[in-house]
Amino acid sequence: MDELTIKRVKTGLADPAIGPETIALMLTDTCNLSCVYCRGGRIDEGRGKAEESELTTEELFRLFEDAAGFKVKEVNIGGMRGEPFCKKDIRLILRKIKSLGLMGSMTTNGSMLSGALAEEMSSYGWDILLLSLDAPFARLQHQLRPAVNGKEYFHNILEFLGALNDNPGSRIRILVNMVITGNNYRYFPEMVNFVNNYRNIESLNVLRLVDMGLPGYSDLQLDCGQAAEFRETLEAFKREKKVLYAGNWSSPDVRREMPAGRHTRCFTNYYILSIAANGDVLFCPQQYKAVSGLNIRDVRLRDLWLNEHFSFRKILSESAPCYGECCTILRKQNEEIYNAVCDG
């Protein structure tokens, strides 16, 4: 984690006027895939009309301009509930972010990527693309993340990555997120080989399956035997520079790995401001729960950050009940901040 981020959090704990480093924006609630472990809005469920309640392009541009003026470093376009490329004017939105000198990162399912898009995004200097890819080949990817319209799309991902490979001037950093299930864990070695074929892929982030209340969760989760087998696989690849994961995978359930008495303090909201597609402020970029009384439509960014409703940040920094379900990246960042703030 960047030392400047840690310093910003330490200062922000004492001075509420220190703004966020990152705006985590859930751009749309509409998605063109029907992933087996996702509860997001799909086009076939009538969520295509969700744009009516979402922030308009003009409102988004105002937010980005406010962010640049508030010394925000990065706009992170999330994919928790929807696919960013389903958003109207998405290409204009990405260009606007970069035109203001902001760092741009985005999570995508990859289904709407193309070689032409790789060239376009490279031309205006897009920074990071987090690609949700759970298999190194089409059949399994389409099984785990099928398209609503039934069409195959894996070739679009290959075309995008291939175009980046062929463009030595492209600086787009690709972070591949792989959710481990009983269906794909045995293909992890092939996945490592896959990411090593592409220069722009910086990391393969190994993610646990999160229980989102879906009926098929138990069928997808690793059983104890599979978890032990996968742990041995991870051990074999521990020297692989691109492979990143949290915990020791001693249990299928990450919460069982947490030692008794381990801290559950979350500092995320001191450097990340999470905003839903309709403008509501969220408690966390991983927990889609709105903070009552806070919407970016009603107030400018600087004033919103100083609102009294943000007292929830201090509560979570003392104890966060959702800490055990946190994603790999945020848990690692929280560990570093905790060590610097509480032990340093």
Task: Show which residues each predicted segment covers.
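Conserved alpha-helical substructure of the radical SAM core
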Residues: 1-128, 143, 147, 155, ...
